[in-house]
From Swiss-Prot:
This is Enolase. Signal peptide: none annotated. Its main location: cytoplasm. It comes from Shewanella baltica (strain OS185). HAMAP family: Enolase (MF_00318).
Length: 431
């Protein structure tokens, strides 16, 4: 038995200079797992709660000492002597100990850090890589794939201090034969984009996720500049590389309207969906995330009706990795894909349940980082171990993003042909 003999929590720093929770789980025999919870900027209102201290004299109120104390006291006491390989049991113990719908007693950041650390400790105990352990927990042992990266090379919205309303403009190197080749293509486009921006006299500073954050006249301008960079890098837009957007529309939804302040346009719900469709008619956009507010379910039905057969429509703030909300979406034919973020739901077991539910309903599942990240690369193993097929982990700079890409390179090297890179086939509506 992989007996837990100690659980340790500590406060560490995330990529935005804010505190977050790191946990260690120690087993008999010297096996140790360590993991850290990420943190979001544009967050869904129904996400599990990230417990912050609120003490303005420390880290401007963003300290996590209360969550850390919960790890070192209540959670530690509850898990001592338990089997680390029994992931579902461990997670349920913590969920029951918390006893709230959104984990606001112990904090989703506390529970998640321990949940992931336990999985890493269990993998070490079994002598297998984390992705292999996750595949076993998922009921799909040995079934792997390398994910298509959605590379966020131009940032706006809550991730950048500029006038661009849409939060993420991403490239997907779908024409690559391997993940390694896809990463190289993305890096070359990223560096070429820097040159294009520089030559136009535009800012080459980066946002939270490592993408460039220039001021632009319109959201369409962002797509035009990326198109220029893709072609200048020697690739063909539409076959070698496709585009994806994360609108994070909840962030500019005001009084029932979608207010694109950066370009001075205001849309009603259907009008904004029509606007997005017009962009997709001009450029090879194959995936749109959070194209409407999380509460605008009638609008989502219309958006799915007009674009859902050809474009992947991803629910992030809409579904918040929550099976109860996803069930409603599936029953009502809302969207056709879910974004998967560990900390929206707060445990590995619940995360795997959301991925499984999505796949069984014919939805795709896109594994994602948060804008506040650490060097923890667990999402790379999650993407491969569940054969999710797609990953969002930022741009090609900032080591908090690149850590995930580097872990994927290592995994591909280990697995070779056992983890195929399927390109466009992974994206809903493109197979």
């Amino acid at each position: 038995m992989a007996k837990i003999i100690n659980v340790i929590g500590r406060e560490i720093m995330d990529s935005r200079g804010n505190p977050t929770v790191e946990a260690e789980v120690h087993l008999e025999g010297g096996f140790v797992g360590m993991a850290a919870a990420p943190s979001g900027a544009s967050t869904g209102s129904r996400e599990a709660l990230e417990l912050r201290d609120g003490d303005k004299s420390r880290y401007l109120g963003k300290g996590v000492l209360t969550a850390v104390a919960n790890v070192n006291d209540l959670i530690r006491t509850a898990l001592l002597g338990k089997d680390a390989t029994a992931q579902a049991e461990l997670d349920q113990i913590m969920i029951d100990l918390d006893g709230t719908e959104n984990k606001d007693k112990l904090g989703a950041n506390a529970i998640l850090a321990v949940s992931l650390a336990a999985a890493k400790a269990a993998a070490a105990f079994k002598g297998i890589p984390l992705y292999a352990h996750i595949a076993e927990l998922n009921g799909t042992p040995g079934q792997y794939s390398m994910p298509v990266p959605m590379m966020n090379i131009l940032n706006g919205g809550e991730h950048a201090d500029n006038n661009v309303d849409i939060q993420e403009f991403m490239v997907q190197p779908v024409g690559a034969k391997t993940f390694r080749e896809a990463l190289r293509m993305g890096a070359e486009i990223f560096h070429t984009l820097k040159k294009v921006l520089h030559d136009k006299g535009l800012s080459t500073s980066v946002g939270d996720e490592g993408g460039f954050a220039p001021n632009l006249a319109s959201n369409a301008d962002a797509l035009a500049i990326i198109k220029e960079a893709v072609e200048l890098a020697g690739y063909k837009l539409g076959s070698d590389v496709t585009l994806a957007l994360d609108c994070a529309a909840s962030e500019f939804y005001k009084d029932g309207k979608y207010d694109l302040a950066g370009e001075g346009k205001v849309f009603d719900s259907n009008g904004f969906s029509d606007f997005l469709k017009s962009l997709a008619d001009q450029y090879p956009i194959v995936s749109i995330e959070d194209g409407l507010d999380e509460s605008d379910w009638d609008g989502w039905a219309y958006q799915t009706q007009i674009m859902g057969d050809k474009i992947q429509l991803v629910g992030d703030d809409l579904f918040v990795t929550n099976t109860k909300i996803l069930t409603r979406g599936i029953e009502n034919g809302i969207a056709n894909s879910i974004l998967i973020k560990f900390n929206q739901i707060g445990s590995l077991t619940e995360t795997l349940a959301a991925i499984r539910m999505a796949k069984e309903a014919g939805y795709t599942a896109v594994i994602s980082h948060r804008s506040g990240e650490t060097e923890d690369s667990t999402i790379a193993d999650l993407a491969v171990g569940t054969a999710a097929g797609q990953i969002k982990t930022g741009s090609l700079c900032r080591s908090d993003r690149v850590a995930k890409y580097n872990q994927l390179l290592r995994i591909e090297e280990q697995l070779g042909e056992k983890a195929p890179y399927r390109g466009l086939k992974e994206i809903k509506g493109q197979a």
